[in-house]
Amino acid sequence: MATGSHTTTLLLAVALLGLPWPQEAGAFPAMPLSSLFANAVLRAQHLHQLAADTYKEFERAYIPEGQRYSIQNTQAAFCFSETIPAPTGKDEAQQRSDMELLRFSLLLIQSWLGPVQLLSRVFTNSLVLGTLDRVYEKLKDLEEGIQALMRELEDGSPRVGQILKQTYDKFDTNLRSDDALLKNYGLLSCFKKDLHKAETYLRVMKCRRFVESSCAF
């Protein structure tokens, strides 16, 4: 097998099989910064796609089509992540430093570690259940990846404190209640939006550090 192919296969294995991140700069084998970014982006993409698929599956199963638009228009104000001064898109993200984007990404991921622990119970008969039962572990894995990047890029600037004063409620498993359905629908909408932000920040950082043909998004 060619050396380039072997390297690509190894990186994919690290990204997709959940191998541990290096815990310190001197860990062996050392992982290049480009690989740390590539792995973090792959994990964020996977989680964002999972969140989007889960949202669509819940919407299809529980929310009448005629009510979706009006409900969606009332949800944006209830995403607690909107209360932090994080960039709202790629253009704004490009104006922030890598360390700022990593801190925002970490904050977004950590805000969901509690709520998602009941997520799989909301989809007891769902086709996506097989992946939802490990979403907490996937979030923890991405959290570790972001922390590994922060260790590598530590610039000596003071660490920011906890900005997010509130966090999200846990998902409601009482699917016979209309209020619970609307609550879960809103939470899934915020989950999707927040993971999209985290993915965007990581991709912006990766692309401006390592110029590549796949930077358009």
UniProtKB/Swiss-Prot annotation:
GO terms for molecular function: growth factor activity; growth hormone receptor binding; hormone activity; metal ion binding. Zn(2+) binds at H46, E199. GO terms for biological process: animal organ development; growth hormone receptor signaling pathway; positive regulation of growth; positive regulation of receptor signaling pathway via JAK-STAT; response to nutrient levels. One of its GO terms (cellular component) is extracellular space. Disulfide bonds join C79-C190, C207-C215. Gene3D superfamilies: 1.20.1250.10. It is found in: Secreted. InterPro entries: 4_helix_cytokine-like_core (IPR009079), Somatotropin (IPR034975), Somatotropin/Prolactin (IPR001400), Somatotropin_CS (IPR018116). It comes from the Eukaryota. Residues 1-26 form the signal peptide. Pfam families: Hormone_1. Keywords: Disulfide bond, Hormone, Metal-binding, Secreted, Signal, Zinc. Belongs to the somatotropin/prolactin family. Plays an important role in growth control. Its major role in stimulating body growth is to stimulate the liver and other tissues to secrete IGF1. It stimulates both the differentiation and proliferation of myoblasts. It also stimulates amino acid uptake and protein synthesis in muscle and other tissues. This is Somatotropin. The lineage of its organism: Eukaryota, Metazoa, Chordata, Craniata, Vertebrata.
